[in-house]
Amino acid sequence: MLARRSLLRSAALCPLCAPLTAPLGAALGATLGASAARASGGAHWGYEGADGPEHWAALSPEYRACTAGTEQTPIDLAAGIPAQTGRIGFAYHPQPLQVVNNGHTIQVNVAPGSMMAIGETGYELLQFHFHHPAEHLLAGKAAAMECHFVHRSPAGALAVAGVFLQPGRVNAALVPIWKAMPVAAGPVQAVAGVTVDPAALLPRDRTYFRYMGSLTTPPCSEGVLWTVFRDPVALAPEQIRAFAALFPMNARPAQPLGRRFLLESGV
């Protein structure tokens, strides 16, 4: 038991010790582009039918990890192991709105300077985007939506923070994004005179799950540090419906946890 606790403590203090691999580096370019499929030069993919998640690996050799990978995301956050994971810090800043419909989601690109700190490592926020319904499950159940904040460290390591979105009051932070979100795929749109505050989309209670996973879209590259907050943020039912009108389903099904540790803070 002592050895196991030591292992968990080490995993919490050094959650991502490996540098960015070449496949993950290439995948990052695809993830941050106007269209993941176009930016990577890879095969077209989607969420239903012959292009759906169960077929991703067959669409292109670049997508092999979608089936062959052993540390895939999302997962069911069923029972985290209590661990001294330490605090997570955010220094996000309001900024001009840059929004894009990349054909798979609505994405907000972020200017340099907004940071997330995990232990001694700083990760710069690159973009955040949305999934309907939520990709991660919480004890087998999916929230209405999920927001992913994608970060990169100076060494090139990726870290994503996930926030569940559940029906409730109008989310004021989402109003300018929803008002400007393009109805069709296209280039990034800089919305004059409109600012967005990523910090306003974070939950007040910062209890979280942590594990090593992957990108949730092709090429499903692994080596991504995931932090998913337990408590959701509210948005109005009409805000959910507005997003769902554009993306009725853009969530990958839960993947096996396998031999990974799922850690939970604050317990």
Regions found by a protein language model. Name each.
Residues 2-267:
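Alpha-carbonic anhydrase
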